[in-house]
């Protein structure tokens, strides 16, 4: 830089220009100026690590790995959630009560209120002829007693007066004196296990009437009055 140029500059500009010239001489001495130019024009090549990572990501998108499962479930068959409409047989398995109802109605026929009342009237007449020494009551049969559930509730006042205050085995005697043991549940005032066997074995149907006569502390003699269907024929076993 000549002295004439420095005379036309301020002190700050002159000092800055001298610093720039000094830096240029240092870069030329170390050959850094040509190296920086070569770097500027060199083509950019992608990093091999970035390429590898991109390939891994793309492969994961195309072929996803199976979901992780615990060791306890690893050997179990895969659960499929496809909804398939059940066929008729499967629907029958899921709703056995409807099938039982259909069979029952087909074999029983329809029962009118008059037939129910007539069976109950005959049962009351029979009860009036029994030995009053042994307490008794009339129990008309309902659908829940002989088809669904097979739970037979007994009159509460009778249970509180004559039956045990705790659960017990109550024996039922039919007209042939055959014995059937049932489970008496004191807190529910009714017969559970064993009653179904008695009802099915004797062909009890909705609308029939029964007379329970307590001949021993935990033994009933059971008399059965059959109801009649609408065609006037009495239903038998």
From Swiss-Prot:
CDD domains (alphabetical): B3_DNA (cd10017)
DNA-binding region range list: 137-228
One Gene Ontology MF term: DNA binding
InterPro entries for the chain: B3_DNA-bd, DNA-bd_pseudobarrel_sf, REM16-like
Keywords: DNA-binding, Nucleus, Transcription, Transcription regulation
One protein family per Pfam: B3
The UniProt record lists the keyword DNA-binding: yes
Localization (cell): Nucleus
GO CC annotation, single: nucleus
Xref: PANTHER family: B3 DOMAIN-CONTAINING PROTEIN OS03G0184500, B3 DOMAIN-CONTAINING PROTEIN OS11G0197600-RELATED
Entry protein name: B3 domain-containing protein Os03g0184500
């Amino acid at each position: 830089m000549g002295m004439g140029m420095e005379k036309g500059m301020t002190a700050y500009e002159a000092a800055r220009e001298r610093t720039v010239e000094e830096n240029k001489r240092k870069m030329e001495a170390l050959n850094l100026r040509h190296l920086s130019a070569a770097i500027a024009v060199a083509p950019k090549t992608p990093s091999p690590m970035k390429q590898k990572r991109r390939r891994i990501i793309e492969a994961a998108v195309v072929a996803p790995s199976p979901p992780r499962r615990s060791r306890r479930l690893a050997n179990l068959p895969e659960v499929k959630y496809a909804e398939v409409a059940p066929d008729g047989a499967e629907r029958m398995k899921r709703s056995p009560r409807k099938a039982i109802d259909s069979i029952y109605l087909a074999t029983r026929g329809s029962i009118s209120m008059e037939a129910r009342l007539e069976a109950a009237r005959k049962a009351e007449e029979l009860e009036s002829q029994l030995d009053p020494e042994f307490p008794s009551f009339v129990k008309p049969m309902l659908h829940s007693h002989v088809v669904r559930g097979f739970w037979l509730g007994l009159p509460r006042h009778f249970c509180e007066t004559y039956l045990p205050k705790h659960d017990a085995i109550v024996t039922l005697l039919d007209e042939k004196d055959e014995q059937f043991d049932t489970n008496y549940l004191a807190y529910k005032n009714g017969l559970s296990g064993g009653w179904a066997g008695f009802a099915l074995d004797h062909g009890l149907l909705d609308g029939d009437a029964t007379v329970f006569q307590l001949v021993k502390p935990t033994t009933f003699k059971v008399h059965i009055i059959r109801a009649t269907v609408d065609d006037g024929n009495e239903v038998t076993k």
